[in-house]
C-alpha cells in the first residue's frame, strides 16, 4: 500500500473447479479463508480511500454466491467498525429471457459445443453471463467504495478504473489479463502474493511486490498466453484483444513493461453464458491394483465386470446408470489420448465411479461393481484373497448430486449494462 495504488482488485472465481459449484450455488473457497483475505483488502482500501473490486464473487458469480460474499463483506465491515457504499452487480440470466433470445437467434455456441436448446435452459439451476468492464465502471461512477460483482470477464475488475479514467482499453484489459492470477506471472510463481500494475498512455509495467519474486519477459509473456487457444487474439465481451504487435521489455530485475496491445471492437456485443444442470448422483470407490497379471489384462477384466453388473441389474437401462473406471498410473488423466498407454505400470490407482438417477441406486451399483471386481477370476490369477487394496473403510463414498455444464454459449446484446442490474447499499455498522 506504500506504493499508493488507485484500486485493489481480485478475480474471485473460475470454472476450473467444474460445474458443481455453479450448479449447486456453493462456493469452492472456504468462508474463513475468504473472510481473512477480504478483511485485509477492505481495511486497506477504505484506509486509502480507493475502491475494492471483487469479480466473480463466491467463485461462480450466481445469486447465491453473490449473497454469500456480501454477507462476508458486511461481517468484515462490522468487525472493522466501518460502513461502506457497496455495489453488487448481478449476472444471473432468467430462463424466460434466454428462451426469448434463443428464438430470436441471439445465442450461438462458443466453440465445439452443441446448439443450445430450451431444455438446456430449463434444466439448468443457474445460468450466468460474463460481464465486461462497463457494469463495473458504472458502479464506480455511482460512488461505490466496494464492488461485489457476479460473473466477470477475468480482467474486468482490474481494467475498470483505468478505463474509467480514460486509459487505453486494450492496455487495461491486457494488464488485467495478467494481474488476475497475481504472482503466478512471476518467478517463482505463486497465487498467494500480490502484483502491482502501473498503466500509462503507451503501456503498463508489472511488478512482483514480494522481493523473493520477479517478473521476467518470459514469465509475463507466458502468462499472457495462459488459458488461451490463440496466442495473438483473445476474444472477450465486446471485442478482441490483439497481441500481434505486443512487446515485452525487462525494466529491472523485478519489473516488465508491456506495449503494443490493440483492442478491436466487435460489430455486435456478445457476452459468454455459463450454466450447469444436475445429471444424477455419484458414488465412488478408490482401490489399488498391484498384480502384474491383472494389470496386463485390465481392460478385458473391467469390461467383463461391467457386463456382469448390467446383467445383474437387468431392469436398469444403461442410460440410467453410468459406470466408469479411471486407471491412474496408466491413463487416468488423459484417457484415450495418453501416448504411453501401453507402458505397463507396477501398480494402478483405480477409481470406480457410478452416476445414477438416485443416490441409493448409485450406492448399490458401485457396491456391486466393487465386490465383483474384488473377487473376479482371470487367467494367471495366483490368489483368491482379493484383487483390490482399499485405502479407506468404508471403501465407497456417496458424493450427492452431480452437475454438468449445460450452457457454454454466446449471447448477443444491444447494451452491455442491461443484462447486469446493479444495486447500491450501505453495509457495515449503522450510520
Pin down the residues of each PLM region.
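N-terminal glycine-rich anion-binding loops that anchor highly charged ligand groups
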Residues: 3-20
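Structured alpha-helical segments in the cores of large, soluble enzyme domains
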Residues: 5-10, 30-48, 136, 271-273
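Small-residue-enriched flexible segments
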Residues: 9, 51, 127-128, 157-330
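Gly/Ser/Thr-rich loops at beta-strand to alpha-helix junctions
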Residues: 14-16, 57-67, 151-157, 357-359
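Short glycine-rich or small-residue beta-strand-to-loop segments that form or flank ligand, phosphate
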Residues: 24-27, 50-61, 146-147, 349-355
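Hydrophobic or amphipathic alpha-helical targeting/insertion segments
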Residues: 53-55, 59-82
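An acidic, phosphate/nucleotide-engaging active-site surface
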Residues: 93-149
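C-terminal non-catalytic interaction/assembly regions of soluble proteins
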Residues: 269-431
Amino acid at each position: 500500500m506504500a506504493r499508493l495504488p488507485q484500486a485493489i482488485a481480485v478475480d474471485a472465481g473460475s470454472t476450473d473447479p467444474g460445474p458443481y459449484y455453479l450448479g449447486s450455488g456453493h462456493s469452492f473457497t472456504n468462508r474463513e479463508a475468504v473472510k481473512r483475505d477480504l478483511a485485509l483488502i477492505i481495511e486497506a482500501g477504505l484506509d486509502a480511500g480507493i475502491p475494492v473490486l471483487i469479480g466473480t464473487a463466491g467463485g461462480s458469480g450466481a445469486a447465491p454466491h453473490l449473497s454469500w460474499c456480501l454477507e462476508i463483506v458486511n461481517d468484515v465491515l462490522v468487525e472493522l467498525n466501518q460502513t461502506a457504499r457497496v455495489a453488487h452487480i448481478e449476472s444471473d440470466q432468467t430462463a424466460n429471457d434466454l428462451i426469448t433470445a434463443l428464438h430470436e437467434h441471439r445465442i450461438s455456441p462458443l466453440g465445439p459445443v452443441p446448439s443450445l436448446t430450451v431444455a438446456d435452459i430449463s434444466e439448468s439451476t443457474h445460468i450466468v453471463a460474463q460481464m465486461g468492464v462497463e457494469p463495473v465502471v458504472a458502479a464506480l461512477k455511482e460512488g461505490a467504495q466496494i464492488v461485489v460483482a457476479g460473473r466477470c470477464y477475468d480482467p474486468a475488475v482490474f481494467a475498470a478504473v483505468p478505463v474509467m479514467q480514460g486509459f487505453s482499453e486494450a492496455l487495461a484489459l491486457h494488464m488485467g489479463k495478467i494481474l488476475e492470477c497475481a504472482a503466478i506471472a512471476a518467478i517463482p510463481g505463486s497465487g498467494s502474493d500480490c502484483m502491482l500494475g502501473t498503466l500509462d498512455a503507451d503501456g503498463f509495467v508489472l511488478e512482483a511486490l514480494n522481493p523473493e519474486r520477479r517478473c521476467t519477459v518470459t514469465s509475463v509473456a507466458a502468462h499472457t498466453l495462459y488459458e488461451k487457444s490463440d496466442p495473438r487474439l483473445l476474444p472477450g465481451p465486446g471485442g478482441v484483444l490483439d497481441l500481434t504487435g505486443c512487446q515485452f521489455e525487462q525494466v529491472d530485475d523485478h519489473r516488465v513493461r508491456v506495449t503494443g496491445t490493440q483492442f478491436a471492437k466487435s460489430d455486435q456485443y456478445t457476452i459468454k453464458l455459463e450454466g450447469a444442470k444436475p445429471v444424477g448422483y455419484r458414488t465412488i470407490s478408490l482401490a489399488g491394483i498391484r498384480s502384474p497379471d491383472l494389470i496386463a489384462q485390465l481392460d478385458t477384466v473391467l469390461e467383463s465386470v461391467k457386463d456382469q453388473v448390467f446383467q445383474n441389474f437387468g431392469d436398469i437401462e444403461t442410460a440410467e446408470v453410468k459406470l466408469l473406471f479411471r486407471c491412474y498410473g496408466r491413463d487416468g488423466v488423459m484417457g484415450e489420448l495418453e501416448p504411453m498407454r501401453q507402458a505397463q505400470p507396477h501398480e494402478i490407482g483405480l477409481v470406480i465411479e457410478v452416476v445414477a438417477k438416485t443416490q441409493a441406486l448409485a450406492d448399490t451399483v458401485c457396491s456391486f461393481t466393487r465386490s465383483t471386481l474384488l473377487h473376479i477370476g482371470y487367467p494367471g490369477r495366483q490368489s483368491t484373497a482379493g484383487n483390490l487394496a482399499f485405502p479407506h473403510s468404508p471403501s465407497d463414498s456417496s458424493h450427492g448430486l452431480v452437475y454438468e455444464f449445460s450452457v457454454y454459449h454466446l449471447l448477443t446484446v444491444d447494451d452491455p449494462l442491461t443484462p447486469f442490474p446493479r444495486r447500491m447499499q450501505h453495509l457495515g455498522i449503522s450510520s
